[in-house]
């Protein structure tokens, strides 16, 4: 299998420097970090530790053979030593849509996992390869569809040194809806666990029913979400918890009191007190 290697020093430096340009909102303006458009190389030496932003590379659409979307790549310390690593794929919200080019990939670093990594708030002992694809802003639908998520996951598993039983999915808002759509269509084919934030699960449960419970799922939602009402997650999660054939493996719902369409930063930076990373790593695909 072809394996990705370390980002170039230039790409890492450009990305870190461009952190000053990342937006705090969901609109236009400066597009954030810059990086290398080169193909991923095969690494021969393990990556060193240090600031997480130094192990980031932009992979624009069309720059990596077989990649269905442009994406941002983060590799953990030690990657390249031949040890398979867990994979975490982050699906962003609708406000970060783009064309997958170097110009628009920086939008992904506004919030959540990519923001933590770019701001060097991602600890060295967190072992995930993290890949963050960008949705097509020209697509008819706003959110990724199940087969698009599946295609990216399988690309990642083939091109990186991934522990095949430790593939995890997470998403916010539109990305969470895309994750639910994927889980409804593909259940436990690949994914060992999912963390979904501020996305509705009504369509997913209507499509897949109790089969959704074959994958460990931890959902987070704001109590006063004005975009995706909390009932759109409470109702299907309650139905999922009541399933008996099959009974759910591990499904959880955490509702943040007084929170609107948000909740991702306190979830991903663990300030809300829920260690989602340890929880994910506690599950493996069988």
Residue ranges and their predicted role:
Residues 77-83, 137-174:
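Gly/Ser-rich "nucleophile elbow"/oxyanion-hole loop immediately N-terminal to the catalytic nucleophile
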Residues 85-87, 91-150:
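Active-site machinery of serine-nucleophile hydrolases
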Residues 26-87, 128, 177, 181-186, ...:
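A domain-start/cap signature at the N-terminus of enzymes
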Residues 207, 220, 226-286:
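C-terminal catalytic histidine-bearing segment of alpha/beta-hydrolase fold enzymes
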Residues 126-128, 211-217:
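Short, proline-enriched alpha-helix->beta-strand connector loops that line the catalytic pocket
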Residues 158-159, 165-211:
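Primarily recognizes the serine-hydrolase "nucleophile elbow" in alpha/beta-hydrolase
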Residues 1-24:
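Sec-dependent bacterial lipoprotein signal peptides
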């Amino acid at each position: 299998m072809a394996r990705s290697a370390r980002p170039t020093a230039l790409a890492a430096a450009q990305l870190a420097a461009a952190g000053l340009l990342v937006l705090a909102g969901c609109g236009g303006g400066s597009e954030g970090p810059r990086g290398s458009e080169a193909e991923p190389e095969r690494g021969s030496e393990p990556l060193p530790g240090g600031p997480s932003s130094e192990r980031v590379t932009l992979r624009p659409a069309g720059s990596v053979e077989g990649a269905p979307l442009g994406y941002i790549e983060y590799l953990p310390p030690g990657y390249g030593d031949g040890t398979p690593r867990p994979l975490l794929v982050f699906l962003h919200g609708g406000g970060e849509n783009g064309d997958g080019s170097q110009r628009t990939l920086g939008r992904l670093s506004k919030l959540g996992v990519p923001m933590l990594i770019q701001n060097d708030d991602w600890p060295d002992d967190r072992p995930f390869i993290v890949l963050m694809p960008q949705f097509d802003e020209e697509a008819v639908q706003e959110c990724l569809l199940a087969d698009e998520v599946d295609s990216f996951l399988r690309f990642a598993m083939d091109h990186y040194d991934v522990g095949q039983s430790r593939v995890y999915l997470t998403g916010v808002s539109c990305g969470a809806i895309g994750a639910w759509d994927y889980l409804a269509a593909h259940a436990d084919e690949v994914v060992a666990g999912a963390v979904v934030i501020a996305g509705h699960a009504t369509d997913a449960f209507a499509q897949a029913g109790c089969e959704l419970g074959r994958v460990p799922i931890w959902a987070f939602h704001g109590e006063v979400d004005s975009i995706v009402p909390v009932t759109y997650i409470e109702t299907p999660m309650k139905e999922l918890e009541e399933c008996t054939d099959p009974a759910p493996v591990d499904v959880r719902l955490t509702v943040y009191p007084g929170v609107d369409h948000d909740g991702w930063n306190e979830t991903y930076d663990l300030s809300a007190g829920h260690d989602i990373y340890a929880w994910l790593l506690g599950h493996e695909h069988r």
